[in-house]
Amino acid sequence: MARLNPIADAMSTIKNAGDAGKGEVIVEPASKLLGAMLRVMQENGFISGFEFIDDGRGGQFRVQLSGTINKCGAISPRFPVAMADMEYWESQYLPAKNFGILIVSTSKGVISHAEARNEGIGGQLLGYVY
């Protein structure tokens, strides 16, 4: 069966493994975008680490969970957001101000919404984690 949204599948796999109390989870298929999103999650302390595993079929990521994820998900459709509108989207997807992150694809790469606000740039919303 074809995967329609591999980013949403990966985020729900991570959330379900965290809810089950697992220490690590395998996420497939791997992509550069998913790797960049995992890097942002690691920089913000939501996962302990991740590594790429080449299985000859597109690859996988082995993600070490830190147990700090309450909820995570993909944002679909990927809304374009200006820097001035970041606070509106933060209130839509995060439970409180400065609690959790929005993952944004910008011209400077995939970064958190706080970094995008500091840089003064907008982008497209990819996901949220808190």
Curated annotation (Swiss-Prot):
- The domain of life is Archaea
The answer, when asked if Ribosomal protein is one of the entry's keywords, is yes
Question: GO molecular-function annotation terms?
Answer: rRNA binding; structural constituent of ribosome
PROSITE patterns per record? RIBOSOMAL_S8
- One of its Pfam families is Ribosomal_S8
Going by the UniProt record, its keywords in alphabetical order are: Ribonucleoprotein, Ribosomal protein, RNA-binding, rRNA-binding
Q: Is Chaperone tagged as a keyword? A: no
**What's one GO-annotated cellular component?**
ribosome
Cross-referenced NCBIfam families: PRK04034.1
This chain's function reads: One of the primary rRNA binding proteins, it binds directly to 16S rRNA central domain where it helps coordinate assembly of the platform of the 30S subunit.
Q: What PANTHER family would the database entry show?
A: 40S RIBOSOMAL PROTEIN S15A (PTHR11758)
Q: Which family does it belong to?
A: Belongs to the universal ribosomal protein uS8 family.
Q: What is its quaternary makeup?
A: Part of the 30S ribosomal subunit.
Q: What is this protein called?
A: Small ribosomal subunit protein uS8
Native source organism of the sequence: Methanoculleus marisnigri (strain ATCC 35101 / DSM 1498 / JR1)
Q: Which gene encodes it?
A: rps8
